[in-house]
Amino acid sequence: MAEKRDYYDVLGVGRDASDDEIKKAYRKLSKKYHPDINKAPDAEAKFKEVTEAYEALSDPQKRAAYDQYGHAGMNGGFGGGAGAGQGFGGFGGGAEGFGGFDDIFSSFFGGGARQQPNGPRQGSDLQYRMDLKFEEAVFGKETKISYSREAECHTCHGSGAKPGTSAETCHKCHGAGQIQVERQTPLGRMMSRETCDVCGGTGKEIKSKCDTCHGTGREEERHTVKVKVPAGVEDGQQMRLQGQGEAGSNGGPYGDLFIVFRVAPSDEFERDGAQIFVEVPISFVQAALGDEIEVNTVHGPVKLKIPAGTQTNTVFRLRGKGAPKLHGTGNGDQKVTVNVVTPKSLNSKQRDALKAFAVASGDSVNPQDNNLFDKILNKKHKK
């Protein structure tokens, strides 16, 4: 048996290809090699190869398994892939390692009788990146998104057959969806069951294929869905929209859509969960004497009292002025760090006042009145 080609090479895309790039490559190649269009002897084999590659790389879990294990990750030999988690937090881990004795024989002999290839199959999951401004992530928003997906064919309603006709029982597997195959194994010649290569495991054979989908039962559509972004989401978090992925097969349900949030940084604030951080400059006079200053928060400006004698890098807490708690109630806090700023230049009155302050404090200081540039000028004037 010829060695399988790399799925990325089959589709002609790089390993860092986006979902849209993979889908475009598949559409182009599937049309090129579709047996109803291309009559070349190897067209059907290439069409199946392209379809197999797309089914693996268009599914986030299957693609992750393939990237890690190669073709071995596609036959169940490395345990379960990551299962899609509900709500937030990404894809939950679901790997369980090797299964029982039946799983070992399944990997040797093509799946065994436990598989139901002609049963309903859920459609592939999709991933969508949503870019949010800092404030949108804090307060949430409602919006609509549009994306391409494989949907049930509107002409044949997923049957793959021309309207007025129906699929017939497969002549090769007689409706079982599987065929018996004899092969040589380390234990000798064994009989195994594999998915029927004529009907693809459906048990049905389409003689008169739908003109719209060419018998696949699916077509590409531009799908629009409303999304309610919860207040308090963070960069990298995911939200699942059930049933908004691609169409299933054999009457199976649609897959899910995973929205990945990418939050732009703020020029003023930093954030860690529900806590928001900001730095505010104050003068050394404000720090020494105390003051009431205005501080910006995501909820609007508020007043903050600065006690007399405040030191630089002192942190103040504004309770309830942070971001909403995503998995709780109420808001977090905003922490304000004050930085005492030393003036870079003083006029004569300010300088005299500081000298008087130094004398009153008993400090012995040697003021550096002139900078290097001033000293050079003074030397020139003296000459």
Swiss-Prot record:
Cofactor(s), names only, from the UniProt record: Zn(2+)
Source taxon at top rank: Bacteria
Segments forming CR-type zinc fingers: 140-222
Induction info: By heat shock as well as salt or ethanol stress.
Any coiled-coil regions, as ranges: none
One Gene Ontology term of the molecular function aspect: zinc ion binding
Domain J intervals: 6-70
GO biological process: chaperone cofactor-dependent protein refolding; DNA replication; protein refolding; response to heat
CXXCXGXG motif repeats: 153-160, 170-177, 196-203, 210-217
Residues noted as binding Zn(2+) 2 in the record, renumbered to the chain: 170, 173, 196, 199
Entry keyword Chaperone: yes
InterPro entries for this protein: DnaJ, DnaJ_C, DnaJ_domain, DnaJ_domain_CS, HSP40/DnaJ_pept-bd, HSP_DnaJ_Cys-rich_dom, HSP_DnaJ_Cys-rich_dom_sf, J_dom_sf
Cofactor note: Binds 2 Zn(2+) ions per monomer.
Binding site for Zn(2+) 1: 153, 156, 210, 213
Gene Ontology CC terms: cytoplasm
Primary localization: cytoplasm
Keywords: Chaperone, Cytoplasm, DNA replication, Metal-binding, Repeat, Stress response, Zinc, Zinc-finger
Function text: Participates actively in the response to hyperosmotic and heat shock by preventing the aggregation of stress-denatured proteins and by disaggregating proteins, also in an autonomous, DnaK-independent fashion. Unfolded proteins bind initially to DnaJ; upon interaction with the DnaJ-bound protein, DnaK hydrolyzes its bound ATP, resulting in the formation of a stable complex. GrpE releases ADP from DnaK; ATP binding to DnaK triggers the release of the substrate protein, thus completing the reaction cycle.
Family, per entry: Belongs to the DnaJ family.
Assembly notes: Homodimer.
UniProt note: domains: The J domain is necessary and sufficient to stimulate DnaK ATPase activity. Zinc center 1 plays an important role in the autonomous, DnaK-independent chaperone activity of DnaJ. Zinc center 2 is essential for interaction with DnaK and for DnaJ activity.
Name this protein carries in UniProt: Chaperone protein DnaJ
Organism: Latilactobacillus sakei (Lactobacillus sakei)
